[in-house]
C-alpha cells in the first residue's frame, strides 16, 4: 500500500441493510467498482462500541436514536482498499439523508426516510483520520489481508518505468 492514492476505509452495512437482505447487492457494488475487500465480518455492535464510534455526536439530539439504530440488529463491517477509496466510497454511499441522496447511490436506492427516523443502510469513513480510527475500533491488524485481485494487474501495467513495474509485481508473484 505504498502508493499514496491507495487508501483503506471502513464501511458498515447497518442493521437495516442486514435485515432487508441488501448485503450482497451493496458489497457487489464495491467489488464492481474495483475496490478490494481486505477485511469483513458480521457483528452485533454493542452500546459501548457504538458510543466510541459515534463519540463526536455525543450530546446532539440524534445521538440516542443513532445508538439505538446501530445496536438494533447485526451489522457487517468491512475494510475496503483502492485508489482514493475514502472519497469513492463516500460518493457511492450518497448523502447521509436518503431523501437528499442521488438515485443510483446506495442511500438513494436503499435508504428510507420514515418520519423522524432515517434508515440510511451504510456508514462510510469521511477522512483518512476517521478511517484509521474506525478501522482500529473494529479490526485487529491480523484480521486485514493483503492479496492480489485481477484489477491489480491493470494498475501494475501502468508503471512509469520497468523498474517500478518489476518492483510492484511482488503481489502478483505470490
Curated annotation (Swiss-Prot):
Essential cofactor(s): Mg(2+)
Entry-linked Gene3D superfamilies: Nucleoside diphosphate kinase-like domain
Keywords: ATP-binding, Cytoplasm, Kinase, Magnesium, Metal-binding, Nucleotide metabolism, Nucleotide-binding, Phosphoprotein, Transferase
UniProt-listed Enzyme Commission number(s): 2.7.4.6
A GO molecular-function annotation: metal ion binding
Chemical reaction(s) catalysed: a 2'-deoxyribonucleoside 5'-diphosphate + ATP = a 2'-deoxyribonucleoside 5'-triphosphate + ADP; a ribonucleoside 5'-diphosphate + ATP = a ribonucleoside 5'-triphosphate + ADP
Biological process annotations from GO: CTP biosynthetic process; GTP biosynthetic process; UTP biosynthetic process
UniProt cross-references to SMART domains, sorted A to Z: NDK
UniProt xrefs under SUPFAM superfamilies: Nucleoside diphosphate kinase, NDK (SSF54919)
Chief subcellular location: cytoplasm
GO CC annotation, single: cytoplasm
Residues annotated to bind ATP: 14, 62, 90, 96, 107
Location of the active site: 123
Keyword Metal-binding carried by entry: yes
Subcellular location: Cytoplasm
Broad enzyme group: transferase
Family stated for the protein in its record: Belongs to the NDK family.
Functional note: Major role in the synthesis of nucleoside triphosphates other than ATP. The ATP gamma phosphate is transferred to the NDP beta phosphate via a ping-pong mechanism, using a phosphorylated active-site intermediate.
Protein name: Nucleoside diphosphate kinase
Source species of the chain: Thermococcus kodakarensis (strain ATCC BAA-918 / JCM 12380 / KOD1)
This protein's encoding gene: ndk
Amino acid at each position: 500500500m505504498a502508493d499514496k492514492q491507495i487508501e483503506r476505509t471502513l464501511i458498515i452495512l447497518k442493521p437495516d441493510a442486514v435485515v432487508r437482505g441488501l448485503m450482497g447487492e451493496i458489497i457487489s457494488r464495491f467489488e464492481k467498482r474495483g475496490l478490494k475487500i481486505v477485511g469483513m465480518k458480521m457483528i452485533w455492535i454493542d452500546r459501548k462500541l457504538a458510543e466510541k464510534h459515534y463519540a463526536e455526536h455525543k450530546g446532539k439530539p440524534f445521538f440516542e436514536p443513532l445508538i439505538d439504530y446501530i445496536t438494533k440488529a447485526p451489522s457487517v463491517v468491512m475494510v475496503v482498499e483502492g485508489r482514493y477509496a475514502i472519497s469513492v466510497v463516500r460518493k457511492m454511499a450518497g448523502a447521509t439523508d436518503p431523501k437528499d441522496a442521488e438515485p443510483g447511490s446506495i442511500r438513494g436506492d436503499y435508504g428510507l426516510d420514515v418520519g423522524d427516523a432515517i434508515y440510511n443502510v451504510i456508514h462510510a469513513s469521511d477522512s483518512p483520520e476517521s478511517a484509521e480510527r474506525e478501522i482500529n475500533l473494529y479490526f485487529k491488524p491480523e484480521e486485514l489481508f493483503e492479496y492480489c485481485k485481477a484489477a491489480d494487474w491493470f494498475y501494475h501495467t501502468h508503471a512509469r518505468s520497468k523498474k517500478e513495474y518489476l518492483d510492484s509485481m511482488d503481489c502478483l508473484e505470490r
